[in-house]
Amino acid sequence: MQNPGYKVTTSPLAHLTAGLKPVSTTTGVTLQDASLQARVGFRGRQAAGWLELHGYQVPVRANQATWQTDGSLVVRLSASEFMVLADSAASQQSVQQLEAGWQLSDIACYLLPRQDTHAWLRLRGPDIAAMMAKLCAVDLSAAAFPAGAVAQTSVARANSIVINAAKPGESAEFWLLIDSSLAAWFWEACGDAMTEFAGQYLPQ
């Protein structure tokens, strides 16, 4: 059985981000809704091999993330569970194709649609670790939480996946994935926390 794929067209934060305007300069922390970007999950004892068969480089250990040549990010959540997230136009298409191309077969790799289940927020700026310290008990400083690290933890009392998605030579960047039903509340909690760090909201 082939999966028809799914493309999300509305963010759970659309009512909060609709009026946002681009900003000319950003010196502090920025918060952006990335929920319209493609993302998909896979689970099973052969999920790593299935992803490698489709050209993806898989992190060796759990709670690690690896950038791909198409601009997507593969996140390993456990020995047998992965998430693939798009961060470019090319990877948006490839991640959607990856989801649509999955078929139920004898291979122990099972599709976990993530467009509806998880909202996706981006935090950028030099002070994001200090800002997150107000919301999360885990040490997310650069020394303890380097680029490519993943934490499955509580942020603002909500179960969250935190990914250090920083690239070499670019500003610090965290991706936060949380239950879509909590997206609006979580957005406001992050907004309150970034106030003292010259926080700004960015449009999608």
Specify the residue positions occupied by each region the protein language model found.
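Basic, glycine/lysine-rich polyanion-binding surfaces/domains
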Residues: 1-204
